[in-house]
Amino acid sequence: MIILGIETSHDDTSIAIIEKGKILKMITWSQSDFFAQYGGTIPELSSRQHSQNIIRIIDKLKSEFDFSKIDAIAYTEKPGLIGTLQIGFLVAQALSRVLKIKAYPIDHIEGHFFSASFEKNYLFPALALIVSGGHSQLMLAKDKDNIEVIGSTLDDAIGEVFDKVATKLNLGFPGGPKIEALCKDNDFDLVKLTKPKTQGEFDFSFSGMKSQVINLANQKKHSSKNLACSFQKEAVDYLLEKTKKCLEKYKINSLILGGGVAANFLLREGFKKLHENVYIPSKELATDNAAMIAKVLYEKLK
């Protein structure tokens, strides 16, 4: 089965073609450089960028692949920016009519869940930590069709906080990669931050940590590097600690990391030490992409 995937939930325009769960083609155009001048994504402008990019990507893929061989279309339905999601939906429906094949709506978070499964299939039950600019969740899967959210952020998502901390410290956008690059040499003085406590055992809260960094930055007692690197370390430790708590309660056969923040080196290295069977996507597949959307449909139909 050959599936075409479409991903337009935020600021990445991506189209992929997979066959039997393997990636044949994928083109992803990021809007990060465009929005760096604004310090963040502007939904209306993002929709315009998607409208321009998605047609160009389709034209390029059509020159490389025979679209008449495609059996089904998978497009991101939710969650995401309403305007950008609409672009993907309209293109999926148009292709569906032209190619006379069905277009299936896919949940973006499920895409991140399956993003690390291209090399080898998961062994269930599985636990997943999905962390991105819009989401921070712990998910327990009895099998590929029964996935339950057992913990989520009560306020900000971790990727969003990386962006806000970086903006406050004048480090640029997107915040995650900027902070990671700054702290790569590991040469900084740790500024202790208080980790939040939540009523839900596996829930997250990042607004307090964000506020601490902003307040300390206003006091001008610490360098931007010390604050940024301390935030990264404390935030990653917090994510790992929550994941460890889940592992103590649930017996699982696979531990999965997904979402844009999964590209963070510190998180990836710490995650590898938590379980004997860890699945981590490549950096290309950690960020928003259409291959993971197509993979969800493949798992549902196979």
UniProtKB/Swiss-Prot annotation:
Gene3D superfamilies reported in the protein's UniProt record: 3.30.420.40
Q: What residues bind Fe cation, as annotated?
A: H108, H112, D288
Task: Return the InterPro entries for the record.
Answer: ATPase_NBD (IPR043129), Gcp-like_dom (IPR000905), KAE1/TsaD (IPR017861), TsaD (IPR022450)
Which cellular components does GO assign to this protein?
cytoplasm
Query: Cofactor: bound how, per the entry note?
Result: Binds 1 Fe(2+) ion per subunit.
Which cofactors go with this protein? Fe(2+)
Q: What is its main location?
A: cytoplasm
Recorded GO MF terms? iron ion binding; N(6)-L-threonylcarbamoyladenine synthase activity
Superkingdom? Bacteria
Q: Which UniProt keywords apply?
A: Acyltransferase, Cytoplasm, Iron, Metal-binding, Transferase, tRNA processing
Query: Which residues participate in substrate binding?
Result: I130, V131, S132, G133, G134, D163, G176, N264
Quote the EC number: 2.3.1.234
Could you give a single Gene Ontology term from the biological process aspect? tRNA threonylcarbamoyladenosine modification
Q: Please give the catalytic activity noted in the UniProt record.
A: L-threonylcarbamoyladenylate + adenosine(37) in tRNA = N(6)-L-threonylcarbamoyladenosine(37) in tRNA + AMP + H(+)
Q: What class of enzyme is it?
A: transferase
Subcellular localization: Cytoplasm
Q: Which HAMAP family match?
A: TsaD
The family this protein is said to belong to? Belongs to the KAE1 / TsaD family.
The job of this chain, per UniProt, is described as: Required for the formation of a threonylcarbamoyl group on adenosine at position 37 (t(6)A37) in tRNAs that read codons beginning with adenine. Is involved in the transfer of the threonylcarbamoyl moiety of threonylcarbamoyl-AMP (TC-AMP) to the N6 group of A37, together with TsaE and TsaB. TsaD likely plays a direct catalytic role in this reaction.
Q: What is the protein named?
A: tRNA N6-adenosine threonylcarbamoyltransferase
Give the organism's phylogenetic lineage.
Answer: Bacteria, Bacillati, Mycoplasmatota, Mycoplasmoidales, Metamycoplasmataceae
